[in-house]
């Protein structure tokens, strides 16, 4: 599907609503119903509510918080297609960030309320949480439906993530910074060779399933690898933005950080770079597989 181009992917934006927004809202509503009807919370809201950051395992997991916002920068590729990007693009970023935090934080609370701590894992908790809530409200027949909706949402997300970054690499290739192999397109004008290499890399990483002690340990390692790759990109992006502000002062830009001067660029770029660097270092701290 990604080989059909971004235009075809946009037609599947409904996947984000069906597979992410609606299930997240439903999960939060079910948690409220559960507590309001006398259900016992499996999460203790006491002095141990905040994580123990003296434990290195928790520090490693904390670095994964950067994945909350991973992909939001993809909107920058399409900023030229927006009306009044100087006003609407920051608004879209802040709205997207707020929705992301609400979904992840409140959704995590909802799962912690219904699933005992010893039964929580990284790969199955979402479906287990929905299943437990549906059993509580005597609607177990909804479990397969929500599973299909979540799968549809994941597919829509993958389509966007696959098509978007490869378009950026393709733009670099067309500028002459990559060999001609990376500049070839199919009948739809999509960077076919770049997509094939992406697929090959993911396939090779998937083979780690056969050598890891458990699916959860593989998921955690793959998650940390994703964080590292993203953070490398963010380090380059933040430093590159500051560099280009001085090296290409007169380049036309549909969106500019700060109406004048470079102070705001240094503030945003500097904070982003330092935060990414800290998370990058934390990602190398060994963690347990439990």
Where are each of the predicted segments found?
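Cytosolic, membrane-interface loops and tails of multi-pass inner-membrane proteins
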Residues: 169-186, 252-255
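Helix-loop-helix junctions that connect adjacent transmembrane segments
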Residues: 14-147
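Alpha-helical transmembrane segments and their membrane-interface junctions
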Residues: 201-212, 275-289
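TM-loop-TM module centered on a large, flexible mid-protein loop between adjacent transmembrane helices
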Residues: 94-159, 178-226
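C-terminal membrane-solvent junction of multi-pass transporters and transport-like membrane proteins
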Residues: 185-188, 231-286
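Helix-loop-helix module between adjacent transmembrane segments
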Residues: 3-7, 22, 153-156
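Single conserved hydrophobic/aromatic residue that forms the stacking wall/gate
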Residues: 1-10, 290
């Amino acid at each position: 599907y990604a080989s059909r181009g971004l235009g075809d992917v946009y037609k599947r934006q409904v996947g984000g609503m069906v597979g992410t927004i609606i299930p997240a809202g439903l999960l939060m509503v079910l948690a409220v119903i559960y507590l309001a009807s006398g259900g016992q919370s499996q999460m203790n809201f006491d002095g141990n509510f905040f994580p123990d950051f003296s434990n290195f395992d928790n520090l490693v997991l904390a670095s994964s918080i950067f994945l909350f916002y991973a992909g939001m920068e993809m909107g920058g590729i399409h900023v030229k297609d927006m009306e009044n990007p100087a006003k609407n693009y920051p608004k879209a970023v802040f709205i997207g960030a707020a929705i992301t935090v609400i979904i992840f934080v409140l959704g995590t609370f909802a799962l912690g309320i219904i699933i005992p701590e010893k039964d929580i894992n990284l790969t199955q908790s979402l479906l287990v949480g929905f299943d437990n809530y549906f059993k509580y409200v005597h609607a177990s027949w909804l479990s397969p439906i929500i599973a299909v909706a979540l799968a549809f949402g994941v597919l829509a997300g993958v389509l966007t993530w696959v098509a978007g970054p490869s378009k950026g690499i393709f733009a670099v290739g067309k500028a002459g910074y990559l060999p001609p192999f990376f500049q070839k397109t199919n009948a739809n004008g999509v960077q076919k060779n770049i997509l094939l290499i992406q697929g090959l890399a993911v396939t090779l990483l998937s083979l780690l399933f056969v050598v890891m002690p458990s699916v959860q340990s593989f998921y955690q390692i793959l998650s940390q690898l994703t964080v590292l790759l993203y953070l490398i990109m963010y380090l380059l992006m933040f430093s590159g933005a500051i560099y280009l502000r001085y090296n290409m002062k007169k380049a036309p830009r549909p969106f500019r950080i700060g109406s004048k001067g470079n102070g705001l660029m240094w503030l945003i770029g500097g904070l982003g770079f330092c935060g990414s660097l800290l998370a990058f270092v934390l990602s190398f701290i060994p963690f347990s597989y439990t």
